[in-house]
From Swiss-Prot:
UniProt-listed InterPro entries: RNaseH-like_sf, RNaseH_sf, X-over_junc_endoDNase_Mg_BS, X-over_junc_endoDNase_RuvC
Gene Ontology BP terms: DNA recombination; DNA repair
Protein name, UniProt field: Crossover junction endodeoxyribonuclease RuvC
Description of how the protein assembles with itself and partners: Homodimer which binds Holliday junction (HJ) DNA. The HJ becomes 2-fold symmetrical on binding to RuvC with unstacked arms; it has a different conformation from HJ DNA in complex with RuvA. In the full resolvosome a probable DNA-RuvA(4)-RuvB(12)-RuvC(2) complex forms which resolves the HJ.
Originating species: Thermosynechococcus vestitus (strain NIES-2133 / IAM M-273 / BP-1)
Keyword tags: Cytoplasm, DNA damage, DNA recombination, DNA repair, DNA-binding, Endonuclease, Hydrolase, Magnesium, Metal-binding, Nuclease
Signal peptide interval: none
Record lineage: Bacteria, Bacillati, Cyanobacteriota, Cyanophyceae, Acaryochloridales
Binding site for Mg(2+) 2: E67
GO-annotated molecular function: crossover junction DNA endonuclease activity; DNA binding; magnesium ion binding
Length: 159
C-alpha cells in the first residue's frame, strides 16, 4: 500500500510518501511545496493546487493522510485552513481515499506521548524508516510522520 502524508500550510506544504508491504515500510519520496509570501493569497492557493494536481498522479497513493486542523495561532490557522481546502479539492477530484489525523494522534502513535516535541517525532520517523539522517525540512518530516501513523491506523505496521 502506498500512503501519502500531507502537512498542510500556505507557505510550506510538506509531503511524504511511503510504501508499506506487510511489516516493512520504505520511503518513496518526500519534500515540500512552497509559495511566496509576496504573491496574493489566491495565486498562492492556485500554485498549491497546480503542484498537488501534478504530484498526486506521480506518487499514485492508495491512501492520503492529512493533518487535521489543530488550533495554535489564529494567523497561522487561517493559512492552514485555506491550504486544506485546496488539498481537499484536489483529493476529491483525483478520487483519493482520505484519512485525517490530529497532531496529538501522530505524536502519540510514533513516540507514545501526545505532546512530543518536533525533534522527538523526527527521531521516531528516522528510526522507523531507517533513514541515515533526520528527515528535513520539518514539514516533510511531519508529512512522513502522518503517513507512518496512517499505516498503523490501517493495521499495516505494528507500533
Amino acid at each position: 500500500m502506498r500512503i501519502l502524508g500531507l502537512d498542510p500550510g500556505l507557505a510550506t506544504l510538506g509531503y511524504g510518501c511511503i510504501e508499506v508491504y506487510r511489516d516493512t515500510c520504505q520511503v518513496r519520496d518526500f519534500g515540500v511545496i512552497t509559495t511566496s509570501a509576496d504573491l496574493p493569497t489566491g495565486d498562492r492557493l492556485q500554485s498549491l493546487y497546480n503542484d498537488l494536481h501534478t504530484l498526486i498522479p506521480i506518487l499514485q497513493p492508495d491512501l492520503v493522510a492529512l493533518e487535521r486542523l489543530f488550533f495554535y495561532r489564529m494567523s497561522h490557522t487561517i493559512g492552514v485552513a485555506q491550504a486544506r481546502g485546496v488539498i481537499l479539492l484536489v483529493l476529491s477530484q483525483r478520487h483519493c481515499p482520505l484519512l485525517e489525523l490530529t497532531p496529538p494522534q501522530v505524536k502519540q502513535a510514533l513516540t507514545g506521548y501526545g505532546n512530543a516535541t518536533k525533534i522527538e517525532v523526527q527521531r521516531a520517523v528516522q528510526r522507523e524508516l531507517h533513514l541515515c539522517t533526520l528527515p528535513q525540512p520539518d514539514d516533510a518530516a511531519d508529512a512522513l510522520a502522518i503517513a507512518l501513523t496512517a499505516s498503523r491506523h490501517c493495521g499495516h505496521i505494528n507500533g
